[in-house]
């Protein structure tokens, strides 16, 4: 949802839009809670409070002040990510298709012939890093830019088996127009940039597990972050390959040679970061014009020095000349060298051309070895061709996508590799590597071993759920790692599937109850965004490829109502109850009936089950930004930090009742996952709360009334306001609590309206209006370790007779309290008080 704050109402009506006017009788937190549970996508918030907007944004719900109609029109028609700290809106708006254009934020693409293969009459537009060049389109009171691009489709095409780009991009645009927006993926770059900048400032050592190419620009400015990936393809790994011949397969209609060069250099750069943890000088020989340097410089201040007879416009220092082996002495330490020397074939005979290529390959290798033979802190990536070669066994082979698969591949070496044992590799084996291997990632660092790190902050986004990892080891890491942000695939199946397929892999699935963490926040993507200064206008699809975000060691843990809070907890319930269900009271009715409380009079105002816990369980797929386990734990320990709002502290037994209702709901819906989740949350409640039951009571609290509007034949009709199992030494403590609640007890608005048979030969009158006070007193007794209340639900009633009688219905009648007393069962009254 998105909340657009206005000082004045607007005359125009918008689809899927609701108006909310700030309620001055409620504080900012209550207003935020009410807004968050509205069911439309767009909320026009009138007479707004800035504090309420802050609360919503911290909760991950995009909430923005609107000053002009242009701002309203722009934000209401698309989704966006909002940086509420820096006041920047990142639109995810594809309406630019109506200009017959596709967009990119990678400059090198604009220098290719891609426009020859677009839809007829279409063009390509460069929009800058996260759409920064579009800021001029929006003259708004906040900074606004459109981060939507088609780079995801272009890159997917490059790695696909499709050759016809026009057909491919047409299909992708049609898909984009007919399927739900993948909002998390679109906002992820904004999130990653914010996340790693924040963590790099706050933590000395940061470890990142499982980066992919989507992050290849994100980490350019973070050389100290330690990366873990799937490891490199080494020369010695070719021993498994059978010999093949030249294939000559075209991968792309438009020229992607620059993309290949960029990936080669970035792979080398990140290998340098991995070893030396600082930025090198980047030397490049023969890869002009290297327009992609412009892209790299949008993210980092890396320095490039280049050699080529052709211009390299974005190099810091370009030598418009050939590079010879004697020029190696001009190259400094603390550097990487990219060698991409290859003479154009022109009209040369094929055999002559082949001889020249092999000779240049040998020369390139000599330059690489000479560069690595002296000095320190150096890594080299050199262009190779398939030929009989001796190569160091520990050198890394690279084969990033290029326009055509021919004879070309690349070799990456550091100083140690260049001095290592060399092995003869036949030409046919290298062709086998080239024909069958595409390097899919610029991050080729070693895999992460699933163990805790004492002084490091671990980040693992979408990296650990894969079933190649041992599930128990993943759980153990999350339980024990002190500082981390780790994601795992949420179990949003209905049959409690232990793993689910995604693309061509399988992921383990998890619920919050799979982890034993008492210092971590377990939330959703949008809940995590709020913690890092971002909010989003569209939540993830409830049955999509969704993840739990687990933050350990955060200073936000105790701020229960500010982050990963209960905002939107009733939203799905409202959507169902006010549209599909038999009555808008369905949730209240079901919760009472499923706990054998059949008095439904006033069920919507006097309910004995925690609606928070019930909704958090049965609709967890729709809102798991609310960290239910943390909410339970902090209340059980009394450590919850509450900033504001009308906050009602549930008695632990209300939480148990909610689990029982959720369990009943799950059985009716055949939802095996919710059934397990409810059981495990109930077990967790029993673990963190020391709940005892007075199922064998020796005292009770009685309420005697001045008026009973029914016939009765018991000696003194009374309401049993709970039973206790206590020693005589505890009587003074019980009496102190009763005295403390005297005014509230006598102030209860107690009513009755019918009689019924509670059981065979037990004829009673219903009682309404006491549950709220009952649970407050329950909490007071619980905190003093006084056993109060039974394991079955407390159903308020007055016993009238121990015989079978007919039900009587009367007008709702108020009952007036005469006295409240504490009496021993089958014994004497030990305390009483009157109003």
From Swiss-Prot:
GO BP annotations, alphabetical order: symbiont-mediated suppression of host innate immune response; viral process
Keyword S-adenosyl-L-methionine: yes
Active site: 718, 720, 797, 799
Region (GTase/RTPase activity): 556-692
Name of the protein: Protein VP3
Region span, 2'-O-methyltransferase activity: 246-428
Region of interest (N7-methyltransferase activity), ranges: 171-245, 429-555
UniProt source species: Rotavirus A (strain RVA/Human/Japan/S2/1980/G2P1B[4]) (RV-A)
HAMAP family: Rota_VP3, Rota_VP3_A
Subcellular location: Virion
One GO CC term on file: viral nucleocapsid
Signal peptide coordinates: none
Family: Belongs to the rotavirus VP3 family.
Region (2'-5'-phosphodiesterase activity): 693-835
Keyword field: GTP-binding, Host-virus interaction, Hydrolase, Inhibition of host innate immune response by virus, Methyltransferase, mRNA capping, mRNA processing, Multifunctional enzyme, Nucleotide-binding, Nucleotidyltransferase, RNA-binding, S-adenosyl-L-methionine, Transferase, Viral immunoevasion, Virion
Catalytic reaction annotation: a 5'-end diphospho-ribonucleoside in mRNA + GTP + H(+) = a 5'-end (5'-triphosphoguanosine)-ribonucleoside in mRNA + diphosphate; a 5'-end (5'-triphosphoguanosine)-ribonucleoside in mRNA + S-adenosyl-L-methionine = a 5'-end (N(7)-methyl 5'-triphosphoguanosine)-ribonucleoside in mRNA + S-adenosyl-L-homocysteine; 5'-triphosphoadenylyl-(2'->5')-adenylyl-(2'->5')-adenosine + 2 H2O = 2 AMP + ATP + 2 H(+)
Transcription regulation recorded as keyword: no
Disulfide bond positions: none
Matching CDD domains: capping_2-OMTase_Rotavirus
